[in-house]
From Swiss-Prot:
This is 5-methylthioadenosine/S-adenosylhomocysteine deaminase. PANTHER family: AMIDOHYDROLASE-RELATED DOMAIN-CONTAINING PROTEIN, AMINOHYDROLASE SSNA-RELATED. It catalyses: S-adenosyl-L-homocysteine + H2O + H(+) = S-inosyl-L-homocysteine + NH4(+); S-methyl-5'-thioadenosine + H2O + H(+) = S-methyl-5'-thioinosine + NH4(+). Pfam families: Amidohydro_1. Substrate binds at E91, H184, E214, D299. Binds 1 zinc ion per subunit. Keywords: Hydrolase, Metal-binding, Zinc. One of its GO terms (molecular function) is 5'-methylthioadenosine deaminase activity. Belongs to the metallo-dependent hydrolases superfamily. MTA/SAH deaminase family. It comes from Haloarcula marismortui (strain ATCC 43049 / DSM 3752 / JCM 8966 / VKM B-1809). Catalyzes the deamination of 5-methylthioadenosine and S-adenosyl-L-homocysteine into 5-methylthioinosine and S-inosyl-L-homocysteine, respectively. Is also able to deaminate adenosine. Coiled coil: none annotated. Its EC number is 3.5.4.28, 3.5.4.31.
Length: 432
């Protein structure tokens, strides 16, 4: 058995206490074998965690990883105008090679900032799955289906592809890839199609992921057309259950919060994107108080504009307090749990905690920095002070993805150069 020892540091335990300990992981099973006193464990390989904090690998619960190619392309617009005037015209020109290049860039960015698992919505999912496999990460992937603006044949083709991709790729990358059926949103997929295809997904035991209640402009048309709130409409169709998680959930009322809790439907909160697009402030503390599982996602780099989950934790805590008008709301420990254990629960992975038997997904934070001094409360630092660039090592499934800030699973320079070339070509094609 090949074992990796993470030694010399402090460890964040599942109850959010911090203790000095070593962590031993099996590189055969990909699990944590032991967490014990310093000097009591031995491994075949070691990672030095001196002056560091060992934390669970972060979980990006909602993103569009290949949209790194659109980073900085269009800013300072509301969601609908941004999508229709800038994003969708460029996305129409995307090739499979573009998406692979953008995905690799995004995965490198995540590895460098301690993220080990992600939930992605996009196209050319086989390319993204291959990139995830090479990266050694975990992911929930799916093909995002849209029916608006399409004839019946094209609409059905989209939804069939979403089902087929989910069936085909589930369990890829030695089980590190899971899949979801992905109708884009309640306003971009017609009711007749949802009523036909959602039961097929449920019959195949596929989880479901979609955008919901992101902006007021998504809520009003559904209320006007169907006479009920969006999540009540979704529940009527059969979309809400314990294997469904929605992205955003910004404009939800009390009845919808109760409905999410009753059905076991989770929420991927994307605070930076919601702020940048002026979509609104999600009532995260109300969701948590009701028992809803809430994870954190970056959304795409085009609306964020990075994939740093530490930035996202800080944003989630800040905007959560504003939304609740309560400085004690969405506290430091809560956002750390949202970015780790809660995110893992949404995605269905046995990770998000440093504990014997859990997936060996972890990151080591270098605490030897001015902005992390003094160390009164390391959980506070994780939520409010740590940057992605403070990550020293990243491990997923027991394998070292980054050692001493050097990514080992990709040629980072080549990935960056290739992504830049594809981005330039993409924008040029879209402008023709």
């Amino acid at each position: 058995m090949s074992e990796l020892l993470v030694t010399g540091g402090q460890v964040l335990r599942p109850d959010l206490t911090v203790e000095r300990a070593d962590v031993l992981v099996s590189q055969d099973s990909g699990d944590i074998v032991a967490v014990d006193d310093p000097g009591t464990l031995d491994g075949d390989d070691e990672l030095d965690a001196s002056d560091g904090l060992v934390i669970p690998g972060l979980v990006n619960a909602h993103t569009h990883v290949a949209m790194t190619l659109l980073r900085g392309l269009a800013d300072d617009k509301p969601l609908d105008a941004w999508l229709q005037e800038d994003v969708w015209p460029v996305e129409a020109e995307l090739t499979a090679d573009d998406i692979r290049a953008g995905a690799e860039l995004g995965l490198v960015e995540m590895i460098r900032s301690g993220t080990t698992a992600l939930s992605d919505m996009y196209f050319e999912v086989e390319e993204i799955a291959d990139a995830v496999d090479q990266a050694g990460m975990r992911a929930v992937l799916g093909f995002t289906a849209v029916t608006v603006g399409k004839d019946d044949e094209a609409a059905r083709s989209d939804l069939e592809e979403s089902l087929d991709v989910a069936r085909k790729l589930d369990g890829a990358a030695d089980g590190r890839v899971r899949t979801t059926f992905q109708p884009h949103s309640l306003t971009t997929v017609g009711e007749e199609y949802l009523r036909e295809f959602v039961p097929q997904a449920l019959e195949d035991d596929l989880s479901i992921h979609l955008h919901a209640n992101e902006t007021r402009d998504e809520v009003t048309p559904i209320v006007d057309e169907h006479g009920q709130r969006p999540l009540a409409y979704a529940d009527n169709i059969g979309l809400l259950d314990g294997d469904t998680y929605v992205a955003h959930g910004v404009h939800v009322d009390d009845s919808e919060i109760d409905l999410l809790a009753e059905t076991g439907t989770g929420v991927a909160h994307c605070p930076a994107s919601n702020m940048k697009l002026a979509s609104g402030m999600a009532p995260v503390q109300d969701l948590l108080d009701a028992g809803v599982t809430v994870g954190i996602g970056t959304d795409g780099a085009a609306s964020n504009n990075d994939l740093d989950m530490f930035d996202e934790m800080r944003d989630a805590a800040m905007i959560g307090k504003l939304a609740a008008d309560d400085a004690s709301a969405v506290d430091a420990g809560t956002v750390v749990e949202m970015a780790t254990a809660n995110g893992a629960a949404l995605l269905g992975f046995d990770s998000g905690r440093i504990e014997t038997g859990a997936n060996a997904d972890l990151a080591v934070i270098d605490l030897d920095a001015p902005h992390l001094t003094p160390a009164h409360d390391l959980v506070s630092h994780l939520a409010y002070a740590v940057h992605g660039s403070d990550v020293r090592h990243t491990v997923c499934d027991g394998e070292v993805l980054m050692r001493d800030r050097t990514v080992e699973v990709f040629d980072e320079q080549a990935v960056r150069e290739r992504a830049s070339e594809h981005a330039a070509s993409l924008v040029e094609r879209a402008g023709d």
